[in-house]
A protein has these predicted regions:
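Iron-sulfur-associated redox domains of electron-transfer enzymes in respiratory
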Residues: 1-118
Length: 118
């Protein structure tokens, strides 16, 4: 699907209907070499950086996406560095604000490119 950047994805994009969402921090696909095969396959991707972009905008956009679509599940994947945990926090906040009960899972990637148990 296109676009993938949270800033650019319309909240009512057709590919969001009945989606399993993968919300990824920008650095993850570069740090984790098996990103496409192990994380992205079968999911709709939203990508962004909570440190460099407007986190409040992200929260509002993701809340709208949750409210206005039938999202089946959400996986939030981020790096182990402190700035990346902002993505998980804003996804949790958006989920709470949406009033929806959508299963949320977290994937934490080390700076060496491996999974870290959540």
């Amino acid at each position: 699907q296109w676009p993938v950047q949270i800033m650019l994805v319309p909240s009512n994009a057709p590919y969001l209907k009945d989606a399993d969402l993968l919300i990824a921090a920008d650095c993850v696909p570069f740090a984790y070499p098996d990103f496409h095969d192990t994380l992205l396959k079968g999911k709709v991707l939203l990508v962004g950086c909570p440190k460099l972009d407007d986190a409040q905008f992200y929260k509002e956009k993701i809340t709208d996406i949750f409210k206005n679509n039938t999202i089946k599940s959400v996986t939030c994947v981020h790096m182990e560095v402190p700035c990346c945990f902002g993505m998980l926090n804003l996804v949790k906040s958006a989920l709470s604000d949406s009033g929806k009960d959508i299963p949320l899972s977290e994937v934490n990637i080390s700076i060496k490119g491996s999974f870290i148990k959540a």
